[in-house]
Amino acid sequence: MQKLELLYEGKAKRIYRTESADMVWVEYKDSATAFNGEKKETITGKGRLNNEITTLLFRKLQEVGIKTHFVEKLSETEQLVKKVSIIPLEVVTRNVIAGSLSKRLGMEEGTVLAEPIVEFYFKDDDLGDPLVTEDHIRVLNVASPEQVSVLRDMALQINQVLIDHFASCRVRLVDFKLEFGVTDEGEIILADEISPDTCRLWDETSNEKFDKDVFRRDLGNLTDAYEEILKRLGGISHV
């Protein structure tokens, strides 16, 4: 499989065409951004870590029957994935109060929820990716009610798998963001990535943060935090 011309470049990844109409080539970048791109920095090794961690987690999900776009890891920073039409919704699942939810509800960060909360955010940089209700989604016409139901069910299924998997590594899955795509056959599958860029991950005992909040809040060395997650997941750390 050959990497051809650049199709799209986002904050964290570049997407390239391949000679297969059904596949695209993903390259993870070393860039870190926060607050809708207001805070930016290049962090050497971040792309490798996100690629390695996403590979491990997508393979885990595939093992239990959850369909994803992941095909194979190509290099330390690259992977081959199925081409899908991305649904312009970020699906956020929350198990513990943190971040914007703490501010929105006036609840203390770290409060464990009795059951998960699933939220939808409309993917639009100009609007700042606003939180939307299912009624808003219907007005925006970006997903049908049936698709929204599938997204919610898949997010909750993935949540339970990841909660158990991270717990085995002594990590608490606080919350995480997912993106989904539609195949040419009309099937909804998991896309994008699952990494410390898209999850809040805390040590189960100390609540030490191993995610992008380290960068957002200037809490320490981001690569050290991501390396710790990779090590606990059983990947090959470069420390």
From Swiss-Prot:
**Catalysed reaction equations from the record:** 5-amino-1-(5-phospho-D-ribosyl)imidazole-4-carboxylate + L-aspartate + ATP = (2S)-2-[5-amino-1-(5-phospho-beta-D-ribosyl)imidazole-4-carboxamido]succinate + ADP + phosphate + 2 H(+)
Recorded E.C. number(s)? 6.3.2.6
- What is the uppermost EC class here? ligase
MF terms from GO for this chain are: ATP binding; phosphoribosylaminoimidazolesuccinocarboxamide synthase activity
Recorded metabolic or biological pathway in which this protein acts: Purine metabolism; IMP biosynthesis via de novo pathway; 5-amino-1-(5-phospho-D-ribosyl)imidazole-4-carboxamide from 5-amino-1-(5-phospho-D-ribosyl)imidazole-4-carboxylate: step 1/2
Report whether Ligase shows up as a keyword of the record.
Answer: yes
Entries under InterPro entries matching the protein:
SAICAR_synt/ADE2_N, SAICAR_synt_PurC, SAICAR_synth, SAICAR_synthetase, SAICAR_synthetase_CS
A biological process (GO) of this protein is: 'de novo' IMP biosynthetic process
One Pfam family assigned to this protein is SAICAR_synt
Assigned keywords, A-Z: ATP-binding, Ligase, Nucleotide-binding, Purine biosynthesis
| Record family assignment | Belongs to the SAICAR synthetase family.
Return the HAMAP family for the record. Answer: SAICAR_synth
PANTHER family given in the database record: MULTIFUNCTIONAL PROTEIN ADE2, SI:DKEY-6E2.2
Q: Which NCBIfam families match?
A: purC
Task: Report the protein name in the record.
Answer: Phosphoribosylaminoimidazole-succinocarboxamide synthase
- Which organism is this entry from? Bacillus cereus (strain AH187)
Name of the encoding gene: purC
